[in-house]
Amino acid sequence: MSLLKIYWRAMQYLAVERTATITMCVASVLVALVTLAEPVLFGRVIQSISDKGDIFSPLLMWAALGGFNIMAAVFVARGADRLAHRRRLGVMIDSYERLITMPLAWHQKRGTSNALHTLIRATDSLFTLWLEFMRQHLTTVVALATLIPVAMTMDMRMSLVLIVLGVIYVMIGQLVMRKTKDGQAAVEKHHHKLFEHVSDTISNVSVVQSYNRIASETQALRDYAKNLENAQFPVLNWWALASGLNRMASTFSMVVVLVLGAYFVTKGQMRVGDVIAFIGFAQLMIGRLDQISAFINQTVTARAKLEEFFQMEDATADRQEPENVADLNDVKGDIVFDNVTYEFPNSGQGVYDVSFEVKPGQTVAIVGPTGAGKTTLINLLQRVFDPAAGRIMIDGTDTRTVSRRSLRHAIATVFQDAGLFNRSVEDNIRVGRANATHEEVHAAAKAAAAHDFILAKSEGYDTFVGERGSQLSGGERQRLAIARAILKDSPILVLDEATSALDVETEEKVTQAVDELSHNRTTFIIAHRLSTVRSADLVLFMDKGHLVESGSFNELAERGGRFSDLLRAGGLKLEDKQPKQPVVEGSNVMPFPVKGAVA
């Protein structure tokens, strides 16, 4: 994007507060006009002194304009600061809301630290541009646009000096912009790398300390900082050169104005007051051109940050759902995967032609080796990704035709990583349902076998759990996650080995709670331990993205296929605890021929 396009798009964010923005612009224009009038009045004062005429009137007018200029400048500074601060927070909140509504696949591809860094640096750059626009940029443009015509009405020859000065500044600015464009983009990439390293290290500080990586990680940060310096310094050199050239041009112009003015006065072709006015014009123009140079520097520096931010904004805007998209209401829990295929880009992994049906209230256990596609199936159900082929239907409705909000409302998930916020215990449980009463929160905690350990904490339900639940044990974190799902009370439940972090006694309690929770709900269990799938109505054995076997636990156990091999490898007895059950005719599993599948 060109600098003007970047600048124009940045200014468009001010349109939300149109009245305040217009008020600031009008006030800025008045400040610019008053500033331009001051050299003219000062010249008249000097001319009156030289002519021994009336000095009181021009002096009084000059003082009045000066006082008005001070008050207007204070008004603009105060209003611009407040407006820029409000819009920075507003843009940050709006962008944040769009970011957290983006599918998980988008976040996984982009990276959390990258999106966060882009948002923070871009909003800071926008704040600076908005503030400078209302304080200086607009007044500078108005002053320069009116200064030359006013000067030309006084003396064309002296005006040419000012015009040449402006042309020189423009040429220097274009040269520096051309030379620093790629360099500034490289600087921004190095900033991202440095920030990502810091974020990655701090988020894994326990590993850093445990493996004594403090010195090596710090050295890596020094290397990133050195690379950033090496990219930044050439850019800074060009701007330093531009500053020197601009200063040389302005000094030379001032000397020319003085010499020409003195010459024209001695020849009787100009008055002393007019020369003084042109000296004021030259000083005003030099100051404004310096502001233009600083403005170009700011915009060039912000260019890479804002381009990336605008791309992120466009990406999130493109993924926003239409306002009239239908909601998924009154969910019963009948779920069909119909020849569903999805492959991760450039990986060769995914799921392929998966078909099965789950009746309302049934429990489905998904098993298989690592990388088999178990989690991918659940992600497809929740529309983390959309199928490349086939369709997923809930109660006969394609999930792609309903709003993500209503779909997420219908599904409660207990992740293997509990995913707790750095908030109180009650706030973390209340994530399941924000408007739940204290009694409902406590009831959910009791059902998840969490109530007793919560009350044992010094502050009970008001206890802060730390970042990602760092102040709790693994079992405590998992029980809060289960309580959250219980409180959400959704018709579809997803359990990613929800009891894996619990001790035997607690697991028995939580398993009972989970059984109660899954009663009359369609439940998916991503199983890493086969002991958790015995009570499932349907077992899906995944391998390399294909649904290799499907059926009841006992049916697959007796089939002698891959699932049976996995049972034996786990050391479980097939007849232990569960009597043999006959295979029910009219299975709800849709026939699916897979090459190489065990029959």
Curated annotation (Swiss-Prot):
PROSITE patterns: ABC_TM1F, ABC_TRANSPORTER_1, ABC_TRANSPORTER_2, NDVA. InterPro entries: AAA+_ATPase, ABC1_TM_dom, ABC1_TM_sf, ABC_transporter-like_ATP-bd, ABC_transporter-like_CS, NdvA, P-loop_NTPase, Type_1_exporter. Its main location: membrane. GO terms for cellular component: plasma membrane. It catalyses: [(1->2)-beta-D-glucosyl](n)(in) + ATP + H2O = [(1->2)-beta-D-glucosyl](n)(out) + ADP + phosphate + H(+). CDD domains: ABC_6TM_NdvA_beta-glucan_exporter_like. This is Beta-(1-->2)glucan export ATP-binding/permease protein NdvA.
